[in-house]
Amino acid sequence: MGETMSKRLKFHLGEAEMEERSFPNPFPDYEAAASAAGLAAGSAEETGRVCPLPTTEDPGLPFHPNGKIVPNFIKRIQTKIKDLLQQMEEGLKTADPHDCSAYTGWTGIALLYLQLYRVTGDQTYLLRSLDYVKRTLRNLSGRRVTFLCGDAGPLAVGAVIYHKLKSECESQECITKLLQMHRTIVCQESELPDELLYGRAGYLYALLYLNTEIGPGTVGETAIKEVVSAIIESGKSLSREERKSERCPLLYQWHRKQYVGAAHGMAGIYYMLMQPEAKVDQETLTEMVKPSIDYVRHKKFRSGNYPSSLSNETDRLVHWCHGAPGVIHVLLQAYQVFKEEKYLKEAMECSDVIWQRGLLRKGYGICHGTSGNGYSFLSLYRLTQDKKYLYRACKFAEWCLDYGAHGCRIPDRPYSLFEGMAGAVHFLSDILVPETARFPAFELGFLQKD
């Protein structure tokens, strides 16, 4: 009886903690909204019928049946972006002048303006991006090597901006400096971890980013293969050490903890290894990466969420960095690589958890906020074309339109890309072009439907 009471108490405490970490979702889900709008409930894929085209713009849905965002919602987003950019620029006057990172520093702001240039075509944003990246290139620390938290970010972003401005000499100089870090990355004797924020996967992203943004061959195949090989050998080594070679051939840890999520964990590493630009051979993907993903899949909570680490049994965090919003991306990539429906099905289950528990009290940011959670819906929409996920993304964007009105926690770096306002602006701008949206400093190409 005591054990039963303990379980009940734990259950109720869990529910209370969920409420403490997120706001109850006030929005009706897509089926109810579509039904209220006079459209067929559910997606066309689920019912096998094509939804009728409305003759007038429907005030209840933020997009047309063809997926194009309706003008009044576009206007609301554009107005909010302008407002938030003004607040952000004012706030950045007191930001840490030495933080050059993409995560919380100037490179993240450069990435935001690069994104706004991509969405609008306005050259002013590209030049603003250049202003910010120039600051970072003058202050490289030489201490960290990744895209998000190290020198690889400023150098890769600088190379792309200079390339877009047709300053090829400066662009190549950035690439050369980036590749000078290569020896440190591939050295197995180094203490370098493998995760995205501070490890090899974060450097790999920088190389793949250049080949995606500038063009194939910008970084040679050999350099990429050597980084991939170092990541794989490291994963095999820990797996042997932990005696998990058969169950999880590629095992990773950060600070002696086997994290699951996208930022510090296996989801982020597996996701990078499955990128087509990483050119990992099919045998390695099938024999090493796939069973490792399946091992992590089996750690899923009954709710559909995932633990922050393999040893953690508490269903608490629904963030991109820890939980379903990060794992969903590896499941979607696995579905594309291995063509097995189970991965898509579980990605959809992740989406349901994010819809229920993803409006976070931590704020509106990308790493552990509502914007980062909203990107999971955009990724699922691009792959499936199911309007349900576009609707969910739009509703999370609608929440962000009331930035600051919900009583969320104020982050340590309130104007930054991954913790603060810049991230929300990035997400809102991607809602304007959902077909080409991508999670910054993480997603590379665009998910395509088979």
From Swiss-Prot:
Chain ranges passing through the membrane: none
Q: Name one GO cellular component term.
A: nucleus
CDD domains, per database record = euk_LANCL
Question: Positions modified as Phosphotyrosine?
Answer: Y198
Interaction with inositol phospholipids: where is this region? 2-14
The disulfide bonds in this chain are none
Keyword terms of this UniProt record: Cell membrane, Cytoplasm, Lipoprotein, Membrane, Myristate, Nucleus, Phosphoprotein
Tell me the SMART domains matching this sequence.
LANC_like (SM01260)
UniProt modification remark: Myristoylated. Essential for membrane association.
Question: Where do we find N-myristoyl glycine lipid attachment?
Answer: G2
Q: Mention one GO molecular function.
A: phosphatidylinositol-3-phosphate binding
* Quaternary structure, from the entry: Interacts with an array of inositol phospholipids such as phosphatidylinositol 3-phosphate (PI3P), phosphatidylinositol 4-phosphate (PI4P) and phosphatidylinositol 5-phosphate (PI5P). PIP-binding enhances membrane association.
Family assignment from sequence similarity: Belongs to the LanC-like protein family.
**Role summary:** Necessary for abscisic acid (ABA) binding on the cell membrane and activation of the ABA signaling pathway in granulocytes.
Q: What is this protein called?
A: LanC-like protein 2
Species name? Mus musculus
